[in-house]
């Protein structure tokens, strides 16, 4: 071994060897238990950031440990490669999106190789490659065939200045992030997936995921937003129109003093046409188009409304109820109409107070009256129904069911379950995405592209114009085609799919990435799925994870996969911070992984990122912490180097010859136990590394305190080999070199994970704490497992204890074996 730890030579050397030997390539093996370890694949932005390093280092430790424990491990990597930044590069730099993307992929692949992550690169996928998006398109057609894909008008974010559609992420404080023009809502024909058909299953099956963090499951529950209640039908006075309203509180129906419609509600125009209210209402509707859904529903946002001049009839008491429009009601939720019950809903109360609308109490506390004129806030607790006709005196919870039954009996309502979850809008007016494989024919209508004609290839040389339509619209060789049914002239769909569609099935493609005739091979999917451990940021808790679950359930129903949940266990790692803030260019606090690797090596970077904090917590970057990890690896290098030649030459069988031998042997097995449990059961990589550091300290202690001629080289060889094996998943390059130095022939990563010996953990001696009247006075070494009577005898006969007890009478002696003795004494009378 070289005297100096030279990571600049060691790391590239072993990366080349791993690649040449296909060390991490994997195939199906029915004789081994399988383990599918997956980190969320990245968008190829061009460079890895520290969040990537953390994510992939965590996954790599899990994958490497599982391999060493005898599992057949699938650990793939790929690229979520479609998306808006590539189009921005085309617009601002004149670089074609494909060229920009593939260049970024090449650079990030190089950086991942430099990190030493144990990926099976033979399974690499990129969602922008025709071999991949051909099957994304095929899956869209399966959704369409089964009635889960459909087209309808929907509102999108529209920037009038750029004349383009914006994604939600591009709307900042209600304005376009590029030009700061206020963004408005505009209706366009869009494609949707019917994810709401799966709302109940998506909700219920969260119970089947004990390996997911509770916070993620709660976020999904809230996003699905299941609520039970009633749909109440209000008739519009003087017309045949009806307004269905969903409410979770039918018990408050007698307290309705107004109705509110969303500004986009189709009835608004009908109700106001030709009336004095038409102009002001139209102005209000236009103003609402410049507010995002988030702005309109924010609790701190002022609620604005306007009377339409129309009235509805309350079905339970036939009272006239004024119909308003308001900015806080969304067409996307429920029916786009809500009933105003100001006495029992705080938002309604504030709206009624602002516009001087009546307040009618219909629920009072069980033990007191509740005059409407004295209300300072809405009464939202349970109570007794009042002013509610035949339901007076009922507990309101009972009234919910009774009022619903009454509505059903008169044909003016029904029990209903509502969801916050909306169908998934997948259309994007973008170029750099998977083209939606549909054709429009004047004779035949909407026609799917035949499966044998896939993929619908993205054309090159497209012009990017800020028109609000996909750039594909202005590419006649793409748009103009023939109808597959009648052979007449037809037009291709020019929208592309939301990039979340591509990432909703990539974990299936990894199981058979080279398949030419299908999206994935069923036998291989059945072997590898579910993903045993999925790792990624909590920011993906809702959209990506929800969509992937939906896709898997739909494909299961189509008979294409055998599982209903894609990810058995989920780890959401925290962010990497610097100076207390998330790393970002704007804050000037970015630390480049490449710079750290060039200065300290990949093993140091990995070790620090795993050691600095538990994975689920945010990690504060520390230059001193990186230096400390680098010094530790140098200590390990020197330790192994100082023994390598001697332990290779040492012969004979292992014997424990001294107390020092016994302590080192015990420490080794305690470390194996601790590291195994921390990595496999708790993902406490930081405490696992800490235990390895303690073992290194123990080895140095042995080296420093045991005379050289008395040192047990067979034992030290065994300890160092186990030490290197334990460290290997965390620091894979240096451990290969150390393993070779200790005489290893194969890769250390082919070694079996060490097993601890329970008998080796038994301590020969323990330190016994001695208390007198509960206060620690002394300590002594005694043989482990000593009987209570013997412990009591040794303590009471100890000189220091006898002196402390002089003049006192021993009342009793409390013995906690192998831990402490408490002598209870009082002054002798």
From Swiss-Prot:
Q: Does the keyword Aminoacyl-tRNA synthetase apply?
A: yes
According to its UniProt record, the EC number is 6.1.1.4
Q: Where, by residue number, does ATP bind?
A: 585
Which keywords belong to this entry? Answer: Aminoacyl-tRNA synthetase, ATP-binding, Cytoplasm, Ligase, Nucleotide-binding, Protein biosynthesis
| Motif 'KMSKS' region in this chain | 582-586
Catalytic activity reported: tRNA(Leu) + L-leucine + ATP = L-leucyl-tRNA(Leu) + AMP + diphosphate
Provide the GO biological process annotations.
leucyl-tRNA aminoacylation
Q: What superkingdom does the record give? A: Bacteria
Q: Broadest EC class?
A: ligase
Q: Name the family.
A: Belongs to the class-I aminoacyl-tRNA synthetase family.
**Name of the protein in its database record:** Leucine--tRNA ligase
| Organism whose genome encodes this protein | Moorella thermoacetica (strain ATCC 39073 / JCM 9320)
């Amino acid at each position: 071994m070289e005297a100096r730890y030279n990571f600049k030579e060691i790391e590239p050397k072993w990366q080349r060897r791993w690649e040449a030997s296909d060390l991490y390539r994997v195939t199906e093996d029915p004789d081994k238990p399988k383990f599918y370890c997956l980190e969320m694949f990245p968008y190829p932005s061009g460079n890895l950031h520290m969040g990537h390093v953390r994510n992939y280092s965590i996954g790599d430790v899990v994958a490497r440990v599982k391999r060493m424990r005898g599992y057949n491990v699938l650990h793939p990597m790929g690229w979520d490669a479609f998306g808006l930044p590539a189009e921005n590069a085309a617009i601002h730099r004149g670089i074609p999106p494909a060229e920009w993307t593939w260049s970024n992929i090449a650079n990030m692949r190089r950086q991942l190789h430099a990190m030493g992550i144990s990926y099976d690169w033979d399974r690499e996928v990129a969602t922008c490659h025709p071999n991949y998006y051909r099957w994304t398109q095929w899956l869209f057609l399966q959704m369409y065939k089964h009635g889960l894909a459909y087209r309808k008008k929907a509102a999108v974010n529209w920037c009038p200045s750029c004349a383009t559609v914006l994604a939600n992420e591009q709307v900042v404080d209600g304005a376009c992030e590029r030009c700061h023009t206020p963004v408005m809502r505009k209706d366009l024909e869009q494609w949707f997936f019917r994810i709401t058909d799966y709302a109940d299953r998506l909700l219920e099956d969260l119970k089947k995921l004990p390996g997911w963090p509770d916070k993620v499951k709660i976020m999904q529950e809230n996003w699905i937003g299941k609520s039970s209640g009633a749909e109440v039908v209000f008739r519009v006075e003087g017309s045949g129109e009806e307004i269905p309203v969903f409410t979770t509180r039918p018990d408050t129906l007698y307290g309705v003093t107004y109705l509110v419609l969303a500004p986009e509600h189709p009835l608004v125009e009908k109700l106001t046409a030709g009336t004095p209210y038409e102009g002001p209402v139209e102005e209000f509707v236009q103003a609402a188009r410049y507010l995002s859904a988030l702005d309109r529903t924010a609790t701190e946002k002022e609620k604005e409304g306007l009377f339409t001049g129309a009235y509805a009839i309350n079905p339970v008491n036939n009272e006239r109820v004024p119909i308003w429009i308001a900015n806080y009601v969304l067409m996307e939720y429920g029916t786009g109409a809500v009933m105003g019950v100001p006495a029992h809903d705080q938002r309604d109360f504030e709206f009624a107070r602002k516009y001087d609308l009546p307040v009618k109490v219909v629920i009072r506390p069980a033990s007191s009256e509740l005059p409407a004129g004295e209300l300072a806030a809405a009464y939202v607790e349970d109570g007794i129904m009042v002013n509610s006709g035949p339901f007076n005196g009922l507990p309101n919870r009972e009234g919910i069911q009774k009022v619903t039954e009454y509505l059903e009996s008169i044909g003016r309502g029904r029990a209903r379950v509502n969801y916050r979850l909306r169908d998934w809008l997948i259309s994007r007016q973008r170029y750099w995405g998977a083209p939606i494989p549909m054709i429009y024919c004047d004779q035949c209508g909407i026609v799917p592209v035949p499966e044998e004609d896939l993929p619908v290839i993205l054309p090159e040389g497209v012009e990017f114009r800020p028109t609000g339509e996909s750039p594909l619209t202005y590419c006649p060789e793409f748009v103009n085609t023939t109808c597959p049914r009648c052979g007449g002239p037809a037009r291709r769909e020019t929208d592309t799919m939301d990039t979340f569609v591509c990432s909703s099935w990539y974990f299936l493609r990894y199981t058979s990435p080279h398949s030419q005739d299908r999206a994935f091979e069923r036998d291989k999917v059945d072997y590898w799925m579910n993903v045993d451990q999925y790792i990624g940021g909590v920011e993906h808790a809702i959209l990506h994870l929800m969509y992937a679950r939906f896709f898997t359930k739909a494909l299961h129903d189509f008979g294409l996969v055998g599982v209903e949940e894609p990810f058995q266990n989920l780890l959401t790692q925290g962010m990497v911070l610097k100076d207390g803030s998330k790393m970002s260019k704007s804050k000037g606090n970015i630390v480049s992984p490449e710079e750290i690797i060039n200065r300290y090596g990949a093993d140091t970077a990995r070790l620090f990122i795993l050691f600095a904090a538990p994975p689920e917590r945010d990690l504060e970057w520390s230059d001193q912490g990186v230096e400390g990890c680098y010094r530790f690896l140098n200590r390990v290098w020197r330790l192994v180097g100082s023994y390598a030649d001697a332990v290779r030459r040492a012969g004979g069988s292992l014997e424990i010859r001294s107390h020092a031998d016994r302590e080192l042997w015990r420490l080794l097995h305690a470390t194996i136990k601790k590291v195994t449990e921390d990595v496999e059961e708790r993902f406490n990589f930081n405490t696992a590394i800490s235990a390895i550091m303690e073992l290194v300290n123990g080895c140095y202690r042995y080296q420093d305190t045991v005379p050289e001629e008395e040192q047990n080289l067979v034992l030290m060889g065994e300890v160092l080999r186990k030490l290197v094996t334990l460290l290997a998943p965390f620091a894979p390059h240096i451990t290969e070199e150390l393993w070779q130095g200790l005489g290893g022939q194969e890769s250390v990563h082919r070694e079996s994970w060490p097993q601890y010996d329970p008998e080796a953990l038994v301590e020969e001696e323990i330190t016994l704490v001695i208390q007198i009247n509960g206060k620690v006075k002394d300590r002594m070494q005694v043989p482990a497992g000593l009987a209570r009577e013997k412990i009591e005898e040794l303590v009471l006969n100890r000189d220091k204890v006898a002196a402390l007890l002089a003049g006192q009478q021993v009342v009793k002696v409390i013995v906690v074996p192998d831990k402490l003795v408490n002598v209870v004494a009082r002054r002798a009378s």
